[in-house]
């Protein structure tokens, strides 16, 4: 996963700069989201991965799925990815593009993993605390991970805040071993 993100980052940054310079962040965001969602479909994924298809056929297929959302620049991106056998990066490129777009718009996404589902009040309190810490609007993406035992693990950008029982036990175990 980390390798995909590393390889996808330059593509996402290049597309973001282009979209920002042209004032087309929303259009690129929509096109990349459509491409990522399309590749999540088993039939499309299988068709793209089919070694009997040429790069041009794959680009035409994906361009057809996008319809009028596939401008010249989007087709250029698809051609570059197909030529380098990196179409599988599209979901990671879309995700990183969205992160860059949110930073540009002054919004951060916080991935919150908790041992139990968060209440509305807990979510609001977490969002307010993170907004105060980062000085930006916060969008929460919550998930439940029972292996945390209790507490939460928060991921904002590249920063991890581990306030889980599992994390604390892990830290204590390391301390005891040394």
Curated annotation (Swiss-Prot):
Keywords: ATP synthesis, Cell inner membrane, Cell membrane, CF(1), Hydrogen ion transport, Ion transport, Membrane, Transport. GO terms for molecular function: proton-transporting ATP synthase activity, rotational mechanism. It comes from Laribacter hongkongensis (strain HLHK9). It is a peripheral membrane protein. This is ATP synthase subunit delta. It is found in: Cell inner membrane. Belongs to the ATPase delta chain family. F(1)F(0) ATP synthase produces ATP from ADP in the presence of a proton or sodium gradient. F-type ATPases consist of two structural domains, F(1) containing the extramembraneous catalytic core and F(0) containing the membrane proton channel, linked together by a central stalk and a peripheral stalk. During catalysis, ATP synthesis in the catalytic domain of F(1) is coupled via a rotary mechanism of the central stalk subunits to proton translocation. This protein is part of the stalk that links CF(0) to CF(1). It either transmits conformational changes from CF(0) to CF(1) or is implicated in proton conduction. F-type ATPases have 2 components, F(1) - the catalytic core - and F(0) - the membrane proton channel. F(1) has five subunits: alpha(3), beta(3), gamma(1), delta(1), epsilon(1). F(0) has three main subunits: a(1), b(2) and c(10-14). The alpha and beta chains form an alternating ring which encloses part of the gamma chain. F(1) is attached to F(0) by a central stalk formed by the gamma and epsilon chains, while a peripheral stalk is formed by the delta and b chains. One of its GO terms (cellular component) is plasma membrane. SUPFAM superfamilies: N-terminal domain of the delta subunit of the F1F0-ATP synthase. The lineage of its organism: Bacteria, Pseudomonadati, Pseudomonadota, Betaproteobacteria, Neisseriales. It holds the Pfam family OSCP.
């Amino acid at each position: 996963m980390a390798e995909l993100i590393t390889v996808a980052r330059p593509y996402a940054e290049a597309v973001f700069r282009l979209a920002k310079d042209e004032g087309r962040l929303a259009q690129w965001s929509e096109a990349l989201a459509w491409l990522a969602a399309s590749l999540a479909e088993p039939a499309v994924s299988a068709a793209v991965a089919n070694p009997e298809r040429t790069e041009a056929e794959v680009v035409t297929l994906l361009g057809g799925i996008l319809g009028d959302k596939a401008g010249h620049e989007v087709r250029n991106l698809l051609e570059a990815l197909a030529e380098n056998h990196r179409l599988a990066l599209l979901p990671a490129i879309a995700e990183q593009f969205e992160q860059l777009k949110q930073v540009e718009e002054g919004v951060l996404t916080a991935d919150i993993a908790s041992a139990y589902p968060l209440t509305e009040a807990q979510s609001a309190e977490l969002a307010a605390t993170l907004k105060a810490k980062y000085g930006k609007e916060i969008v929460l993406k919550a998930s439940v991970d029972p292996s945390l035992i209790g507490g939460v693990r928060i991921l904002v950008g590249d920063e991890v805040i581990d306030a889980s029982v599992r994390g604390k036990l892990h830290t204590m175990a390391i301390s005891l071993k040394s």
